[in-house]
C-alpha cells in the first residue's frame, strides 16, 4: 500500500496511483502542503485512518532553483530549506510515536550529490541537501534503538521535472558538458535508476544499515 502526497501535481500523483494499482498494488493520493507542520500531522492522521499503519516514509518532496549567492533572497533560501530539509525532520518526528507503538519503521530520505559535494550557483539547495545528509545520520543515531532505520539516497543528475529547463532545446552545450562529468559518459540518469536502491533500503535486507547515504550518480562523484 502506497500513499502518494501531492500539493499542486494532482494529475502526476494520480498517474503514480494508477501505475501502482495496475501492477496489483494499492495506492491513494493525498493532498497536503508539507512545508507546514499542521499539514504533515493531518496527512499522517489521514493515512493512518485509511490503512492503520505506516511502515516506510520516503521523503522525496523537493525544490531546486539555480540561483547564485548574490541573487539568493530570503524567500528563495527559506523555500528550499523548508521543503528540502525542515519538512523531512517534522515528517519523521510526527511518525516516531506510531513507530514506537508498532516496534519500528523505516525512513528513506532523498538527498543529492549536491549534499555530499557542492556546486556553484545553488547555495540554498546545497545547504538543504547537505543538511539532509547529516540529519539522516543524526536521526539514525537517536532512533536506531527504537528499531527505526534511517538512510538516504544521493542521486546524481536525474531527469525529472526539477531540471527539465536545462534538458530541452538550446541546452546542447550543457548536456555535452554533463556527459564529460561521469566516467560512464551518461548525462542524465533515469528515475528508474534509483528504484533498486530504494527497494533495498525499504527491505529487511538493509536492517543493519543505519545513517548511510548511498550515492547513485553514474560515477560522477569518483572524480
Where do the language-model regions lie?
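Substrate-binding pocket helix/loop in short-chain dehydrogenase/reductase
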Residues: 68-69, 76-81, 178
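Active-site loop immediately N-terminal to the catalytic Tyr-X3-Lys motif
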Residues: 70, 117-123, 145-146, 204
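Active-site helix of classical SDR
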Residues: 92, 128, 136
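Residue(s) in the substrate-gating loop at a strand-loop-helix junction
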Residues: 112
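Short C-terminal tail/terminal secondary-structure segment
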Residues: 117, 181, 199, 210-223
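Short, small/polar-rich loop/turn modules that mediate ligand/substrate recognition or access, typified
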Residues: 144, 149, 209-211
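Catalytic Tyr-x(3-8)-Lys segment
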Residues: 171-193
Amino acid at each position: 500500500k502506497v500513499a502518494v502526497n501531492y500539493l499542486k501535481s494532482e494529475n502526476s500523483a494520480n498517474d503514480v496511483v494508477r501505475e501502482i494499482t495496475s501492477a496489483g498494488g494499492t495506492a491513494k493520493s493525498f493532498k497536503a502542503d508539507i512545508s507546514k507542520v499542521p499539514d504533515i500531522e493531518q496527512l499522517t492522521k489521514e493515512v493512518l485512518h485509511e490503512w492503520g499503519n505506516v511502515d516506510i516514509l520516503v521523503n522525496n518532496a523537493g525544490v531546486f532553483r539555480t540561483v547564485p549567492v548574490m541573487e539568493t533572497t530570503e524567500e528563495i533560501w527559506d523555500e528550499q530549506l523548508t521543503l528540502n530539509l525542515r519538512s523531512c525532520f517534522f515528517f519523521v518526528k510526527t511518525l516516531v510515536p506510531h513507530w514506537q507503538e508498532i516496534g519500528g519503521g523505516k525512513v528513506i530520505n532523498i538527498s543529492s550529490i549536491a549534499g555530499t559535494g557542492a556546486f556553484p550557483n545553488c547555495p540554498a539547495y546545497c545547504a538543504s541537501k547537505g543538511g539532509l545528509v547529516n540529519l539522516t545520520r543524526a536521526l539514525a543515531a537517536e532512533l536506531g534503538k527504537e528499531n527505526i532505520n534511517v538512510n538516504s539516497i544521493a542521486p546524481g543528475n536525474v531527469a525529472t521535472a526539477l531540471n527539465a529547463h536545462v534538458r530541452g532545446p538550446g541546452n546542447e552545450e550543457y548536456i555535452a558538458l554533463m556527459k564529460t562529468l561521469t566516467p560512464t559518459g551518461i548525462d542524465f540518469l533515469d528515475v528508474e535508476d534509483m528504484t533498486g536502491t530504494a527497494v533495498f533500503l525499504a527491505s529487511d535486507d538493509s536492517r543493519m544499515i543505519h545513517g548511510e547515504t548511498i550515492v547513485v550518480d553514474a560515477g560522477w562523484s569518483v572524480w
